[in-house]
UniProtKB/Swiss-Prot annotation:
Binding site for ATP: G136, C137, S138, G139, S140, G141, K142, T143
Species the sequence originates in: Escherichia coli
Entries under CDD domains matching the protein: AAA
Segments of this protein annotated with the region Interaction with TnsA: 495-555
Annotated GO biological process: DNA recombination; transposition
Stated name of the protein: Transposon Tn7 transposition protein TnsC
Upper classification of the organism: Bacteria, Pseudomonadati, Pseudomonadota, Gammaproteobacteria, Enterobacterales
Listed InterPro entries: AAA+_ATPase, AAA_22, P-loop_NTPase, Tn7_TnsC
Length: 555
């Protein structure tokens, strides 16, 4: 069997309510938060040898970061715990050993036969299913986190003694401009993928009404002991095709009550209006608990958020730039947050795009200025959403909360191609470019195996410069003599002549100032912001003494 389809092996959980329930005891063991975090965390690591590879190979490795990197935060552990409780709690009222499951199946059979959702044969058949509403902006990591958590469970468990294929979870997506009936069809489709069955052909393609479809879903869900039904992207549902928000709410409430299995609904803030009345209600009539999945915050209660610091510090280590800064500065971290607003997808992709830009430019270093430039050039599609988040106005946030960003993924691919198109120069190619004539290059090729380029090239250039009329055949003995004598040609070439003064200071172009160390005044100037003076930046870096605080300390 595959990793998602296993034979049942039963373990006592230690929880009395779960004892002797095969659907619960066949699940993976209950985990502490620390172990849960370890099981969710990605194993992506980079080595020093990765750093020495060609730019093309490094670019491909960098582009794997959005898919392979995952750092569990507090919200992930909360969601993991809620899912664990929902799955196991939902099975408490459907224990096949106590007859509870059979009661649900008999009630489901009655509903299918009569076509009425309120019909039952066993009134005392109780439901222990819980429901959950997960709301968050597009790119905040809801779906990625869910996939990570669900991947810690096998999807299908076969119970030989019961002859039952238990489906632990099922995830379906709402299509754009979809209808409520499409949710039912997607349910049968997803179940067929998990089990290799043909429920869609048997039930989905017939002209059943919504009530009949829900009755069929209920019966099949209980027949396969479905542990959790996840419906993602509910903001895509068409209100006009679904009869309006109230009709949609009624559908989801009925689905939770009738199917009798835990249901999780996921969407952006646009979907919140469907459940607004229920969320405002003190009684919570529909029973939807809610998690609002906000972007990670930069500060908490006026202090730096340690989760944001830990997340960015760990991500910063996944650099394949040869001139990278070992430690992430507060300045770069602050700019990173300002641009991304803590939206996880943007945080990671801004980092990846900045690395690719640094590779393409050849400076191989991420700076605050580079992050700003990449944000302006590459992330235009999500500027409205991020500006709405900066405003803090709920109406604006809801309007732009479901912006998708396929353009960013396209840019990742394009930057990979751009880097691949840049010709990687070998040391030999670079050396040949430094020499002026074919004769000089011929001499270099003859001697390059025996002498270091840093000495060989200036020696050849000096020989041709001092003897412009001699052929390379005649200059060869002279070059060899100088090389064997170990004459310090480089230092002589750098000596200023009488007729021409040569500055001993190497001039760095202003366009290259952002590649200097971050303590260099020129680097600090290159990272200036319009709203801050140079004096304020120097003061922030600790270059200028704060006289007021100094006098205060002196008393």
């Amino acid at each position: 069997m595959s990793a998602t389809r296993i034979q049942a092996v039963y373990r006592d959980t230690g929880v009395e309510a779960y004892r002797d329930n095969p659907f619960i005891e066949a699940l993976p063991p209950l985990q502490e938060s620390v172990n849960s975090a370890a099981s969710l965390k990605s194993s992506l690591q980079l080595t020093s040898s990765d750093l020495q590879k060609s730019r093309v190979i490094r670019a491909h490795t960098i582009c794997r970061i959005p898919d392979d990197y995952f750092q569990p935060l507090g919200t992930h552990l909360l969601l993991s715990e809620r899912i664990s409780v929902m799955i196991r709690g939902g099975y408490v009222g459907r224990n096949p050993k106590t007859g509870d499951l059979q009661k649900h199946l008999q009630n489901g059979y009655e509903r299918v036969q009569t076509g009425e959702l309120e019909t039952f044969r066993f009134e005392e058949a109780r439901s222990t299913a819980q429901s959950l509403l997960l709301i968050g902006c597009s790119g905040s990591g809801k779906t990625t986190s869910l996939h990570r958590i669900l991947a810690t469970y096998p999807q299908v468990i076969y119970h030989r003694e019961l002859n039952v294929e238990q489906v632990v979870y099922l995830k379906i997506d709402c299509s754009h401009n979809g209808s409520l009936k499409e949710i039912c069809l997607n349910f049968f489709r997803a179940l067929d993928r998990a089990l290799g069955s043909n429920y869609e052909r048997r039930y989905g393609l017939k002209r059943h009404g919504i009530e009949t479809m829900l009755a069929l879903m209920s019966q099949i869900a209980n027949a396969h002991a479905l542990g959790l039904l996840v419906i993602d992207e509910i903001q895509h549902l068409s209100r006009s095709r679904s009869g309006g928000s109230q009709e949609m709410l009624n559908f989801f409430v009925t689905m939770v009550n009738i199917i009798g299995v835990p249901v999780m609904l996921i969407g952006t803030p646009k979907a919140r209006e469907i459940f607004e009345a229920d969320l405002r209600s003190a009684r919570r009539g529909a029973g939807f608990g809610a998690i609002f999945w906000d972007p990670i915050q930069q500060t908490q209660r006026g202090k730096p958020n340690q989760e944001w610091i830990a997340f960015t510090d760990n991500l910063w280590q996944l650099q394949l730039l040869q001139r990278k800064d070992a430690l992430l500065s507060d300045e770069v971290r602050d700019v990173w947050y300002e641009l991304s607003q803590g939206v996880m997808d943007i945080v990671v992709k801004l980092f990846v795009l900045a690395q690719l830009r640094a590779l393409a430019l050849g400076n191989e270093r991420i700076t605050a200025g580079l992050l700003r430039q990449v944000y302006q050039d590459e992330l235009k599609p999500v500027h409205p959403m991020l500006e709405a988040l900066r405003s803090g106005i709920p109406e604006r946030i809801a309007r732009y909360s479901d912006l998708v960003v396929p353009e960013i993924d396209k840019r990742l691919i394009q930057l990979q191609l751009d880097i691949a198109a840049i010709q990687e120069q070998t040391p030999e190619e670079k050396a040949l470019q430094e020499l002026d004539t074919e004769d000089q290059r011929h001499l270099y090729l003859m001697l390059k195996e025996d002498y270091d380029s840093s000495l060989l090239i200036p020696t050849i250039k000096k020989a041709f410069s001092q003897n412009p009329t001699m052929t390379r055949q005649k200059l060869l003995p002279l070059v060899l003599q100088w090389l064997m004598e170990g004459e310090t040609v480089v230092s002589e070439l750098e000596k200023p002549s009488k007729s021409k003064k040569v500055s001993a200071i190497k001039v760095v172009k202003p366009s290259d100032w952002d590649s200097l160390p971050d303590t260099d005044l020129r680097y600090i100037y290159s990272q200036r912001q319009p709203e801050k003076t140079m004096h304020e930046r120097l003061k922030g870096k600790g270059v200028i003494v704060d006289m007021a605080s100094l006098f205060k300390q002196a008393g």
